[in-house]
From Swiss-Prot:
GO terms for molecular function: ATP binding; phosphoribosylaminoimidazolesuccinocarboxamide synthase activity. It catalyses: 5-amino-1-(5-phospho-D-ribosyl)imidazole-4-carboxylate + L-aspartate + ATP = (2S)-2-[5-amino-1-(5-phospho-beta-D-ribosyl)imidazole-4-carboxamido]succinate + ADP + phosphate + 2 H(+). Pfam families: SAICAR_synt. NCBIfam families: purC (TIGR00081). Belongs to the SAICAR synthetase family. One of its GO terms (biological process) is cobalamin biosynthetic process. This is Phosphoribosylaminoimidazole-succinocarboxamide synthase. It comes from Streptococcus thermophilus (strain ATCC BAA-250 / LMG 18311). The gene is purC. Keywords: ATP-binding, Ligase, Nucleotide-binding, Purine biosynthesis. Its EC number is 6.3.2.6. SUPFAM superfamilies: SAICAR synthase-like (SSF56104). CDD domains: SAICAR_synt_PurC.
Amino acid sequence: MSNQLIYTGKAKDIYSTEDENVIKSVYKDQATMLNGARKETIKGKGVLNNQISSLIFEKLNAAGVATHFIKRISDTEQLNKKVTIIPLEVVLRNVTAGSFSKRFGVEEGLDLKTPIVEFYYKNDDLDDPFINDEHVKFLDIANDEQIAYIKEETRRINELLKDWFEQIGLRLIDFKLEFGFDKDGKIILADEFSPDNCRLWDAEGHHMDKDVFRRDLGSLTDVYEVVLEKLQGLK
């Protein structure tokens, strides 16, 4: 049946469509942190995230990156290819910040000589623990070839994103991606790309991402609107 709720997430709900290989993602006006321990309704956030993510995924598709994105169909809705999500949060870091700085006792804002790719096991009960390649294989999440592909694709996506954000005066600090298997068993980029799952700093070092909510730095939607406007001007 179409339009049946399949999954309720922190930032969006997923519904079935008439096509068994296509889902509808509906973005919500909700901001969370600490794995959902703190929740807040922020009017307009869903519209902004849907617009930003749609724009980024359109550009990734055009650049030859295989993604689940099909098209945006309303202010808060988009159609996506149905995938089986790989239970990994794939984090790429260009600059020290957040949990990385805390874990290794280093200040924020240091450029990393080489971008670092990290894996976190997607499991709310375990608070998404930091894991390595051997853990990924032990948990039967992915094999060596799949791990290598995910890392390679993440680095390729990073180079594209860094260039786009540099063009609009924003520094891409780090970001989180999720991948999934499509109906043919191919690994493709899934989920979303918005200031919810990346860190962006402007030329003055101001946070242009969800850290505004995490650190109570001001209006989240005001910041997201600036990011959207900048992206809309990207050539």
